[in-house]
Amino acid sequence: MTTHRKQLSRRAFLARAGVLSAAVAAGAIVPTVTGLPFASGETKAGLIDPVIALLRPALQELARDTINGLTTFVVPGSDPYSKAQGVSSQAAGSIQAKTPDFLMGALDNFVPLPNEYVRPVAAALATAVSDDKIPLPGDLTKLLPLQLNTVDEALKRILATDETVPLSLVIAMTLNLVATQVNPASLHGAFVSPFSRLSWADKGKAMSLIEGTDSDLVQALDVNLPQPLHQSLSGVLKFVGGALIEFSAFGAFSEYGVFNKQTKTLTGKPVGWTISGYGGIAEGWDDFKGYYQGRKKVEG
């Protein structure tokens, strides 16, 4: 593969994963020839650290936007994400239940998935290539090789850090990659992430690809991974596909959104109670007042 071809392929991958749009939105890169910071004549090495500083919060926003689209796929509501996918409700849904907060917190802090199992996916996302058959949005085609390479290097450093890789980011990039495979038009439109731009039916197709550990998806993630890591990658994706749906549903129907951790009380009626018609816990329980007629044993 020629250098030019590699640049086109890497540009396509970063765009499909949602990274380039997030970087542009955060000001980490400017898609013009004279745009800062690239007009100042700084070297690529001098640009990496400030780009990383801008890219980190941009990637967090990318992850949150993607998770918003995922949770509304599971429990739609009256929010913009649900309406955009074509399946919504007049009642509150996962967004109002703060399910994205629950899911991101669970993925990044509590999911019992050791970092060594997440690492193959993170490594794959850091080195993946993709074909350039999917047309990119106009502003992203104006990126210079220096801009592309700088963002690319910043992403690799973030994913290759010795710190624990946020699982929510790894999942978000994977969902966005599959989203553009299902519908290339998801590269364009509202929201930050391609996955959130999909219709409800297309989101279902994307989840099906992940749950089925589609060979094309594994190939797109990293053609350079050795076979043992390919097997690990497939296993992680298969686990993630099912867990995302389950965690989203659990979070939406739990008391998470109105639970006060300090007082350990509910501050309001949980969204899940309203959706399911649950009337709430009983105000009290019958107290034990002794044995009937003083009996303490039974003789047969």
Annotated model-derived regions:
Residues L8-F38, S199:
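N-terminal export leaders
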Residues P37-L47:
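Ser/Thr/Pro/Gly-rich low-complexity linker/stalk segments immediately outside membranes or between
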Residues M1-L8:
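N-terminal secretory signal peptides
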Residues I48-Y278:
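Acidic/polar surface patches and capping/hinge elements
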Residues A12, G18, S40-E42, A63, ...:
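Generic low-complexity, intrinsically disordered sequence content enriched
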Residues T274-G300:
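Protruding loop/beta-arch "assembly-hinge" segments enriched in small, turn-prone residues
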